[in-house]
Amino acid sequence: MDWKKLQDLLSGVNQYSTAFGRIWLSVVFVFRVLVYVVAAERVWGDEQKDFDCNTRQPGCTNVCYDNFFPISNIRLWALQLIFVTCPSMLVILHVAYREERERKHRQKHGEHCAKLYSHPGKKHGGLWWTYLFSLIFKLIIELVFLYVLHTLWHGFTMPRLVQCASVVPCPNTVDCYIARPTEKKVFTYFMVGASAVCIILTICEICYLIFHRIMRGLSKDKSTKSISSPKSSSRASTCRCHHKLLESGDLEAVPADDKLQASAPSLTPI
């Protein structure tokens, strides 16, 4: 598997991600992909070859191995890493769609026309929803794979001895021994822990996106209210100053008749 191409594809997501997304990407590549490529593949590389059973019955060892390992840990983790990084491609595709739409708009209306998007990679409008759904998909995928891993092997431990009972073509209960169980258990705990960290980071990023969206909406409401309120506030302040001047005696009260005369229009003969 060429992890370098996957890294090159996902490196473009960094410029559209939040701080939590950048940390998530670092955890994926440093603590999961590198550990998978450098160490985990070697530990599980010869697991079927070193799976020993105390029987000479042809085919019994293979059947017992398949009974206990329906799918290998290393292949399950490879699928998990591929599936968990695929939702990030949605963001890249959406940004590419915006850029292409902007390019066609400029070709049609000229270079000096108004832009469709102030910044194609800014998380506003549909791109915000695409980013949010990609995070939800990643969270669901992580949880599903952890559940599958826990269900297939009845936990995250790696036993030294497994027994195959009533499995054809094995004649009776067969004891089988797993190679390097302690080392495999350590790597399993490490990969599960890294997956749990990614789940926490994804939840934090979802909460951050929603909180940031709410705060931005509240700030827009405040700005619209502040634009519409200066006239009323200036009138109120003028009235307060007028009453204070009347109370201090600096301003004489105008009689009602003078007010009427002042407010009445002056009519001149034609």
From Swiss-Prot:
Database matches in InterPro entries: Connexin, Connexin31, Connexin_CCC, Connexin_CS, Connexin_N, Connexin_N_sf
UniProt similarity note: Belongs to the connexin family. Beta-type (group I) subfamily.
GO biological process: cell-cell signaling; cellular response to retinoic acid; in utero embryonic development; placenta development; skin development; spermatogenesis
TM helices/strands, residue ranges: 21-40, 76-98, 127-149, 189-211
Gene Ontology CC terms: cell-cell junction; connexin complex; cytoplasm; gap junction
Species annotation: Rattus norvegicus (Rat)
Protein name per the record: Gap junction beta-3 protein
PANTHER family: CONNEXIN, GAP JUNCTION BETA-3 PROTEIN
Subunit and partners: A connexon is composed of a hexamer of connexins. Interacts with CNST.
Membrane topology: Multi-pass membrane protein
